[in-house]
Amino acid sequence: VQHLKPLEHNESRVELSIGAVPLRIEGLSRSYGSLKVLSEINLEAQRNEIVSIVGPNGAGKTTLMRCISNGYEPTAGSVWLNGVKAGRGAPHSVVELGVGRSFQNTSLFSSLTVGECLRLARYRLERQPMFSYRTDLRLPEAALRILKATGLDKRLQEKVINLSHGLKRALELSVVLATEPTVLLLDEPTAGLTKTERILIGEILVDLSKKEGLCILLIEHDLDFVREVSSRIVVLHQGKLLLDGSVDEVVGSDLVRAIYSGEQLNETMEDVS
């Protein structure tokens, strides 16, 4: 790949259900034997929203992401994506319903070039040969915006292994966006990034939610970053959804302070319920 071009409007993936809620979770639970990791989670997320999921280690945040992106994960309950109920199926079937996911540790092939990673992302949609003689590649505007902002559009021939950690994170986000998701799941996208890189990623995510209409779910331990980018914050603790509110409501909550300080929560949780 030597040249990147924007997708024509009629080349883009047709939205699965016009006007449908991008993500709705009903009564979702996940158990491993007798250990209940998630309990009766109910949650909706809309277009143009960045919903941050916070909570201490072991709260069930990454498990929730897995349940959304893999139909085999939930023990009980249901996940609706763009108006379609996601049945029990492998992750690729969920991708076809409009979900894109970026992992805590980048999942790129280090031996491929930047351009090859992007072509691979488009393979399922375009059915073009992975290693074709075409030197151009058409990508959604959202993916192009990140590539241009980070200079990766000028480094298409460079192998992933030679990229900095920050550029690998940006490339993985571009690869996910190349699949044209309507629901974007991000697991600690700022982990290991410099302050400058965190600011850039934050600006890009806000831009994607507002201009591209994406529904973004974000797991993040950097609470300053969460404050800056979030439309809403959801608090998980011991597998339960304890709080779902605006940034100001959650940041100023006594419950959140208690969770992060390790205080006894029994009385506070009774008040919430």
Q: In which residue ranges do the predicted regions lie?
A:
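Conserved ABC nucleotide-binding domain
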Residues: 87-88, 146-167
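Catalytic Walker B motif of ABC-type/P-loop ATPase nucleotide-binding domains
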Residues: 184-188
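The feature captures the beta-strand-to-loop junction immediately N-terminal to the Walker
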Residues: 54-56
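Helix-to-loop junction immediately C-terminal to a conserved catalytic motif
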Residues: 69
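A short, surface-exposed alpha-helical micro-motif characterized by mixed small hydrophobic
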Residues: 226-228
